[in-house]
Amino acid sequence: MRGRDEETGEFRGASRSQQRREALEIFDLGEKLVALTPAQLAKLPVPESLIPHIEESKRITSHIAHKRQLAFLAKHMRREDEQTLAAIRDALDANSDTARREVAAIHRVERWRERLLAEGDVALAELLEAYPAADRQQLRQLVRNAIHERAKNKPPRAYRELFQVLRDLSQEQGLESGDSELEDGESASEDDE
């Protein structure tokens, strides 16, 4: 409770600045919830009482009205207990971490594809050394076809297929960890020079 302590004369509770920071934090959390798709929202531990307010905020397109509705959503969120809000924050953080890891894995596969197209057999040999179960002939043919398609300005069918094969290989054999090892080895050899 806010106010002065009668015995000590000190202020009790959070300061106005602290209350504003907490209110803005809940407002930001509400914005994140509104930005989610219905499928993503269903995975979160959001109380049923907040769902209509979130849906209403999504429906409103006028800037000022949308902001007013977000403030109304934040007001209802402040009525929820701190454990509920903490559970929502934790779930959102876990979702963003998972999404970041997935994006990083895709970027690693794309780097492998670009290395295969740029360096050819050298990169292919490194890939096959790390992952002997990979089909050398299929990879070599896809690299050759992708280079040919790029030179002739054709649709990138083999380029996409090469990505699919590398992604499947990464999921089956853990290309992500092998790729980071190879990149670490490359940077170490470059540092030695």
Swiss-Prot record:
Question: Which GO molecular function terms does the record list?
Answer: ribosome binding; rRNA binding
Q: Name one GO biological process term.
A: assembly of large subunit precursor of preribosome
Q: Which Gene3D superfamilies match?
A: PSPTO4464-like domains
Where is the region Disordered?
A: 1-20, 171-193
Q: Where is the composition biased (Basic and acidic residues)?
A: 1-10
Record keywords: Cytoplasm, Ribosome biogenesis, RNA-binding, rRNA-binding
Task: Give the principal location in a single coarse category.
Answer: cytoplasm
Note whether DNA repair occurs among the keywords: no
Listed InterPro entries: DarP, DarP_sf
Q: Which HAMAP family match?
A: DarP
Q: What does this protein do?
A: Member of a network of 50S ribosomal subunit biogenesis factors which assembles along the 30S-50S interface, preventing incorrect 23S rRNA structures from forming. Promotes peptidyl transferase center (PTC) maturation.
Name of the featured protein: Dual-action ribosomal maturation protein DarP
Q: Which organism is it from?
A: Xanthomonas axonopodis pv. citri (strain 306)
Lineage of producing organism: Bacteria, Pseudomonadati, Pseudomonadota, Gammaproteobacteria, Lysobacterales
